[in-house]
Regions:
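Glycine-rich phosphate/nucleotide-binding loop
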Residues: 111-124, 128-138, 218-222, 226-335
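Short, glycine-rich nucleotide/cofactor-binding loops
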Residues: 5-14, 143-153, 294-301
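Short glycine/serine/threonine-rich phosphate/pyrophosphate-binding segments
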Residues: 13-17, 79-92, 96-110, 117, ...
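Glycine-rich phosphate/diphosphate-binding loop of Rossmann-like nucleotide-binding domains
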Residues: 15-16, 31-33, 39-42, 145-207, ...
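Phosphate/nucleotide-donor binding subsite
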Residues: 50-94
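Short beta-strand segments
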Residues: 6, 34-36, 58, 99-101, ...
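N-terminal phosphate-binding or glycine-rich loops at protein starts, especially the Walker A/P-loop
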Residues: 1-42
Length: 335
């Protein structure tokens, strides 16, 4: 198995990408193809005593910046690490692609270069979100701001396949994000989507879920349009950061708080670990013909390593093939 890694993507590239890639080679027994400025990558590796064993380097002369317009960048920056990496994936030179670079460019590139599964026009961006009982898969979380009911149905099918194959959960539950639990709630589009989701074979649709209940982690997959998903994701991140900050302030406020921290530090450490998004790797573009994983732009070595692990699991379990079979069944049912 070969996984292609964008060495230039993210706020901490190339050092964090190198550290994560080297750790993945040791821990997961994978071969990597690092795409980027080869001279810079080699110098960074040498300066930080990072082994390049198991990492083949492919030189690129360009990089897509976060400020670049995504579609234009994909068309014009042909020798950028994202475009070169996605083309290598399409040509079968690797089995999956991992990048912490521009989300927009990756979405456009996954659609136009790697192409999409039958029945999918644009991939959905999905991410595992920490929650009280268990992490849940949220999709779409930003790639498709407006969605039709048929798109949400496809998201539900792909999300169910992902949680089953990658997270190892049998018969995952699927819920539709809405402003009320009743079938009568929501916009006309959401009402239609609800009725459609009830008819899909092969998924366990449990109905609508209100935003206040999403953080409980009672369901495995939460389906929504990209606008709603992005709001849920960023609000969750903000609240988590706020709560951890308040907790820290409480412990540091006085001697009693400091003593309480000494008694509870293991529990606090467990909580921080549970809420750490880097533990879950990256966000897959579900619907692309081959696995494309978007690591967080601020990913450190652990986040990159886990995104590579995530890509490896997708390949080993033939996630894209499984999703295509499920989508074909969905389209046959609709006909």
């Amino acid at each position: 198995m070969k996984i292609i890694v964008d060495m230039m993507g993210g706020d901490n590239a190339p050092l964090a990408v190198l550290e994560g890639a080297a750790a993945a080679v040791k821990e997961y027994d994978v071969r990597l193809i690092g795409v980027g400025d080869e001279a810079l990558v080699r110098k960074t590796a040498a300066d930080n005593n990072i082994s390049l064993d198991g990492i083949e380097l492919v030189n690129c002369t360009e990089a897509i910046e976060m400020c670049d317009e995504p579609a234009r960048a994909i068309r014009t920056k042909k020798d950028s690490s994202i475009v070169v990496g996605l083309n290598m994936l399409k040509e079968g030179k690797g089995d999956a692609f991992v990048s912490a670079g521009s989300t927009g460019a990756l979405h456009v590139g996954a659609s136009l270069i790697v192409r999409t599964l039958r029945g999918i026009k644009r991939p959905a961006l999905a991410t595992m979100v920490p929650a009280k009982n268990k992490a849940y898969l949220l999709l779409d979380c930003g790639a498709n701001v407006e969605c039709r009911p048929e798109m949400l149905a496809a998201f539900a099918v792909m999300g169910s396949c992902y949680v089953n194959k990658v997270e190892g959960r049998t018969s995952p539950s699927v819920a539709l994000a809405n402003n009320g639990a009743e079938e009568s709630k929501g916009t006309p589009m959401l009402k239609e989507a609800h009725q459609l989701l009830k008819t899909i074979p092969g998924i366990r649709f449990v109905g609508n879920i209100e935003p206040r209940d999403v953080p409980n982690g009672d369901v495995d997959v939460v389906v929504c349009d990209g606008f709603t998903g992005n709001v849920i994701l960023k609000l969750t991140e903000g609240v988590a950061k706020m709560l951890l900050g308040m907790l820290k302030g409480m412990f540091l406020k006085n001697l009693g708080g400091k003593l309480a921290y000494l008694l509870l530090k293991d529990s606090v450490s467990d909580l921080k670990h549970q809420m750490d998004s880097e533990e879950y790797g990256g966000a897959p573009f579900l619907g692309a013909k081959q696995p494309v994983i978007k690591a967080h732009g601020s990913s450190k070595a652990k986040g990159i390593k886990n995104a590579i692990r995530q890509a490896k699991i997708c390949v080993e379990n033939d996630l894209c093939g499984t999703m295509q079979a499920a989508l074909d069944e969905l389209n046959t049912t609709k006909e």
